[in-house]
């Protein structure tokens, strides 16, 4: 995390912000902006990247934890797509179809691969922007796949398992995490508009999360 990122983290308080830790791989800033645009946001404060990163990491951590349990029950050393589906069922999360650039995913938030809306605050680094654009040339998914894979592997190692994650399982993990993130941001946008504002803030995102999950 950059010095600016650490400074923002230090200034922010909230359940999601607490899931952003120095030393752990995080999604690029450019990805947080694309997720906001996918949710319909036309403008966002610069501090929104922290709770978005926190939510992505938290949701992925819980999914990987339960996928590891399903894998162990099946007596395997590789996380398969079926393990991720089982994890999603245990978490009462919808399992979406894997989207492609041409088809999108019927029944999920990824109904269109076209990115609409004006840019959010901040541009991210040039490397991050290029990384995200490269990812979106072949899929509707927003977070760079190798970055997401690294995050998933770090979490599995943290849980004491150095396992292989099948490509289909990784895709399923990413679809579920990104879909849940976009839905959270859509709810945050409702809070923004109800306050007669147009600029989404980190507080809106944290509030949307608390309304959905209750006091933690």
Curated annotation (Swiss-Prot):
Gene3D superfamilies: Histone, subunit A. Residues 1-12 have a biased composition (Basic residues). It is found in: Host nucleus; Host cytoplasm; Virion. Residues 1-23 are annotated as: Disordered. It holds the Pfam family Histone. One of its GO terms (molecular function) is protein heterodimerization activity. One of its GO terms (biological process) is chromosome condensation. It comes from the Viruses. Its main location: host cell. Coiled coil: none annotated. Induction: Expression of viral histones begins 2-4 hpi and continues along the infectious cycle. Histone-like protein that is recruited to viral factories during viral replication and participates in viral DNA packaging and virion production probably by forming unstable nucleosome-like particles. May compact the viral DNA. This is Histone doublet H4-H3. The lineage of its organism: Viruses, Varidnaviria, Bamfordvirae, Nucleocytoviricota, Megaviricetes.
